[in-house]
Amino acid sequence: MSGTRRPASWWLPRTVVALRVRVFEKVNGDRVVTLPNAAHGPEVFERVYAHPAVNGRSAGAGLSDLFWYWLAPGSEVHQEHLEPGERYEEVAATTRRILAGSSAGLAEAAGRAVADVLDTVPLDRVSLVRLRDLLMPAWAAFAYELVFRRPCPPHARDLITAHADDVITALKCTGLRHPRRRARLTAYLGERIAAGDVPHRLPASLSPSEQALYLQGTFFNTAVVQLSEATAHVLLALARHPRVQHRLSEHPDDDRYLAHVIDETLRLYPLFGIAHRITTGEVPLDDTTVLPAGSVVCFSYPDYQATGHERPDEFDPDRWSDPAARRAPYIPFGVAANRPCPAWRASPIVLRVAVREVLSRFRLDSTASHTRSNPHRAPCLLIPRPLIPGGRRLEALRRFVRLRDGVEDVTRGVRQLVLGTVMVLHARRLRPAARYFEEPPSGRCPVAHPTESKTSRERNG
């Protein structure tokens, strides 16, 4: 299959795409710069991203209201959205402790979780699945074991999966959020903390209810969603590139080539689309332009990682065999100078395990489109290794996947426009981030344990 990606708007009317983009541009306001752009290339992106004054996370950005709305409850204690200070440092240290562990231990836990899910897939026929949906329960169980250091019970796995799916569905504007569904996980985590079931020392600056929200946001939202998305991207890329898949299947212990496949996938389909920061001081953009304090800087990962590579739109894992590729723009886990992903070490380890586990059991095939956002949740045919399906049946299934994908693209695009507009307007009305930072300092001291009020309940959805 060709390495050229099909346009993201296949069958989708250009007017709908343009309208959707305009809706989200309105959220940012006027004091916004997106990097890289026509005037400022990847070198400016890197310099500004690493500038010490580009460290604001939520306060002062209209976009923060939307992200807090999507991620509620507990956005105010989510590690990604905490402002610099003692509270952030304590939360970040806790996350590092929970993620700490041997590579072998992480690999074993991930392999066990993925195998448990794959055991439910029949081996006597071809299965049509959505890869993100298939693997999200595995990463829910993996995250549970990280936090609680014990196997994940089915009830907890279902709660985590339902929560994570609700968050990512809202983020992609393919569905509205369901606060009650998320609240069930919050209540469960609160009960586990009260019972003393968490073997890690949780941040002392957080109240017990905030500790539950911290675990929910960092591990059972972000970790589960990002690992599910990453695995779906890698497997869908393999399904669409049979020669690459065949090479991996024939040489399952080739760590170097598998690393190249993962790198190429995360280069072409970065998990982060736009990361925004707020300047807390003046930041020079070029010789004549200085960004004032309070400016919102949006860092476009897809645009940045498309620079410095030959044939940037082509899926080519072999490009990473060239040492020069390592010097090209590529930051799958962010930049070291500005809060990189805390799972930068663990993620590649467990991703490799998951990919190998799937390929050891199934051959993958997909005619669905592949875009960075993957709103279709990665449709894919799983063909059990011992099975040799009839050519006509397999081709019929491939045609069905292609046709359904095209039809869904039209309806999904319109749905994203409508639901995205609804959520943008709702977030602007609620103003969860803005209202939080407008509260008197005594109501949101980074050390005190604020009591839940009507305002905070509304803020958390």
Placement of each model-derived feature along the sequence:
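Cytochrome P450 heme-thiolate monooxygenase catalytic core
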Residues: 103-229, 431, 435-442, 446-452, ...
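Cytochrome P450 catalytic-core helices
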Residues: 224-251, 342-362
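Conserved cytochrome P450 K-helix E-x-x-R motif and the immediately C-terminal K′/meander segment
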Residues: 252-289
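Active-site substrate-recognition loop segments, prototypically the cytochrome P450 B′-helix/B-C loop
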Residues: 1-154, 453-457
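Cytochrome P450 heme-thiolate "Cys pocket" and heme-binding signature region
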Residues: 320-377
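Conserved cytochrome P450 K-helix/beta-meander segment immediately N-terminal to the heme-binding cysteine loop
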Residues: 300-324
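N-terminal targeting/anchor module and adjacent flexible "hinge" preceding the catalytic domain
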Residues: 1-40, 394-461
